[in-house]
Amino acid sequence: MAKLTKELFISALKEMSLLEIKELLDGLKEEFGIDPNALAVASAGPSNAPEAEEKTEFTVVMKNFGKNRLPVIKVIREITGLGLLDADKFIKVPDQKVKENVSKALAEDIKAKLEQAGAVIELQ
């Protein structure tokens, strides 16, 4: 007797009518003592996983400074307090973290200022 693979079983199920599938489920219940309804309820039951919480702290990441770096340097100096040369070096590094662990409102404000200056920004 050839081994029944999952693919063959699924293919056979596709060709069955609803009545035949119900009879198959009844046969499984009788043969193995399995109640398909209990399995469905158990699998759809409440999860012990914690619900996703809304983020309260964000990191502002500058992907790149865009076409013109001078306006971005000015905004970076304003936000970080860096000097001119340090701000220039800062913006040349891709995926640079501008500010870490800041509130959503502050992160969005920083993002808006930098995007207005031409930078590409991502909030993480």
Swiss-Prot record:
Domain of life: Bacteria
Pfam families hit by this protein: Ribosomal_L12 (PF00542), Ribosomal_L12_N (PF16320)
SUPFAM superfamilies: ClpS-like, Ribosomal protein L7/12, oligomerisation (N-terminal) domain
GO BP terms, alphabetized: translation
Stretches assigned to coiled coil: none
Family in the record: Belongs to the bacterial ribosomal protein bL12 family.
Name of this protein: Large ribosomal subunit protein bL12
